[in-house]
Amino acid sequence: MIRSLYYKPGQPIRTNIPPAEFPRLIRDRKGTLWVDFIGEPEELAEPILRGFGFHPLAIDDALQETHTPKVDDWGDYIYLVLSILNYKQENGMFEAEIDELDVFLGHNYVVTFHDQLLTAVEDTWIACQRDIRHVQDGADHLLYRIVDSLVMSYMPLVEQIDAQIDQIEDQVFDKPRRDILEQIFALKRLLLTMRRILLPQREVLNKLARDDFRVIDPRDRVFFRDIYDHLVRLHDLNESLRDLVSGALDTYLSVTNNRMNEIMKVLTIITTFFMPITFITGFFGMNFFEPVAHLVGWTSQQVFAGMMSVMIGLPILMYFWMRGRTWL
């Protein structure tokens, strides 16, 4: 799908402009044109992109996903690759995938190219149609609004991750289950994916805020510097969350190890209690009552009662002895 939006001072916003008019509109420096490609096939998108005068290498990069945020300066326009983290939560676990947003920024136009509908782009598109202030400040300011919407979309995710970590920490102490461990590893994968996006994307915004691009008004660099500050903060939050997840994993392993040690302790105590009983029955056998009765002059019943008293009394004595040694 190809959709377009054009604003010129003193005129209402136009939408769904035929691609044949794009070359004429970009020659008019007073207006601002935004063309958005959503999953458009290469054979249809490439001729339109060539109509803007883009270099074939830049067009190839836009049509082929690279997943590496970058910015290329081509003089009259710049080409950006931005990564977007799409995520969903099922059964308490996050699943994420990386989408790519390719952007061409000229003096009076913005061209965006992506394979599927992106929330950040869609929100900006709707906002531009509702309020001309989103497009009346020029193409570079429109790019700022798109990127700002993209970056701010990470904040709800960070809050959800933080809340889930708190929940996991409480559950770990109550009852460490197998599914909690799976949630911890899912969070580690998600935060690692975020980190792989934030680091190179931060460098892209740093270049937009500091380098001298002809298509970006020096007065608008401060806006990109603001986005850069947001990315720095997001990166710091990501590092803090990674530390919290690692701490939750260490706590889980510590609690499970302690519980395993308690189980082994109980089993060892039970085994120790039965060791003298096993020794007695193994040494004398189960048919020693008659010989012993004749030897000591007791009846078989008396010998049986005596041996039972010994076998019951020994574990009791061992129990109090272990308590005295603070082993229990």
What feature does the model see in each segment?
Residues 1-226, 230-235, 240, 295-298, ...:
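Peripheral, non-transmembrane regulatory/ligand-interaction domains of membrane transport proteins
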Residues 229-328:
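Hydrophobic alpha-helical transmembrane segments and their immediately adjacent juxtamembrane loops
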